[in-house]
């Protein structure tokens, strides 16, 4: 099925990443050098701006919309301005969900959907009686990568088969 559409950039196309960086390179410079935004992060077309007050962010959002309009680009319309919580228990804000993680001031967690997929795969593998340690490690190493850079040590110890845990962690560190 061919969809004739001229809006946006094709998702999943290798050129999409290149075009996103090409189109937004000057935007990055404008944000950092001219607008002097201290905390700005971008992955392809996902952007995060951090500031001391909501007012600063509302002004910045207005300026960004004007800048992008000059390039004939628009924001998706799902932008959000909110306080970031100290940790998961803090009810005076929320975590920042970005690139597969949920960031708080003092902790980083895996996104819930990634954690659920990790747990499901580990449970499926833990039920197999005749799985080799090598196959077990190969199936779970990518999720281990997510877990090791977040605050998920307890999760790892809980879901990985105890007989594989020590060698699993060593093997994944070597990969």
Description of each model-found segment:
Residues 4-6, 58-59, 77, 81-175:
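Right-hand nucleic-acid polymerase module
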Residues 66-67, 121:
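Juxtamembrane helix-loop transition sites at the ends of transmembrane segments
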Residues 70-71, 158:
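Juxtamembrane/interface motifs at transmembrane-helix termini
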Residues 1-44, 48-65, 71, 78, ...:
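Conserved polymerase palm-domain catalytic core
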């Amino acid at each position: 099925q061919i969809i004739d559409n001229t809006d946006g950039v094709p998702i999943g196309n290798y050129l999409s990443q290149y075009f996103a960086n090409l189109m937004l390179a000057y935007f990055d410079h404008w944000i950092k050098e001219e607008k002097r935004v201290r905390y700005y992060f971008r992955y392809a077309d996902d952007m995060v701006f951090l500031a001391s007050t909501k007012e600063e962010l509302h002004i910045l959002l207005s300026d960004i919309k004007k800048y992008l309009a000059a390039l004939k680009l628009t924001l998706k319309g799902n932008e959000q301005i909110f306080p970031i919580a100290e940790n998961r228990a803090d009810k005076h804000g929320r975590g920042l969900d970005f690139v597969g993680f949920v960031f708080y001031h003092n902790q980083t967690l895996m996104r819930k959907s990634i954690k659920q997929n990790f747990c499901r795969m580990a449970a499926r593998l833990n039920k197999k009686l005749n799985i080799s340690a090598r196959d077990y490690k190969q199936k779970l190493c990518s999720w281990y990568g997510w877990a090791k850079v977040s605050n998920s040590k307890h999760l790892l110890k809980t879901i990985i088969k105890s007989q594989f845990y020590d060698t699993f962690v060593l093997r994944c560190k070597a990969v």
